[in-house]
Amino acid sequence: MKLTHLAALALLPVLSAPVFAGDAGSLSNPNLPPAQFLAQERKGNLNMSTGNPNNRAAEVFYRTGALGTGKSTTHSVSLREGGVYAIYTDCAPSSCENVDMELLHNGRVVREDHMDDTYPLFHIIPSRSGAYTIRVKMAQCKPGHASCAYHTQVIKEN
């Protein structure tokens, strides 16, 4: 079993917990328009990582975009050695079926999440400071959707 799969198994209790969506304990509504859904997920990710859904000071990086099936894009982010980071990509389930994410350093994949889902995530403690690349690939939009809205978010946890 790959290390990323073991890490995902360790996160199952966290992933099965309700996501913050305005009121503690409520689930994000997958039928919301993409921008509203992603705004709720942004707060939910901050809440999971820092205990505060409005702690934007912990947000190292945040971008939104849209990709068609099979398309990918990259984002550059600076990470510090020894920092604890949570890296999330979420796509709006009203148009998205599967999105994948990889973290690269000096062209080498150091973390990846290729599970069949709409919320790839992982934690990392970099062994070196520097520029890292987040590659987002829209594996599958829902039928009838030319592109899917997504966001990528990096949160410093310590």
Report each predicted region and the residues it spans.
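Bacterial N-terminal signal peptides that target proteins for export
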Residues: 1-8
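N-terminal targeting/docking segments
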Residues: 2, 19-20
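Cleavable N-terminal signal peptides
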Residues: 8-9, 19
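C-terminal edge strands of extracellular/lumenal beta-sandwich accessory domains
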Residues: 22-58, 103, 131-158
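Acidic, Ser/Thr/Pro-rich low-complexity intrinsically disordered segments
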Residues: 61-147, 155-158
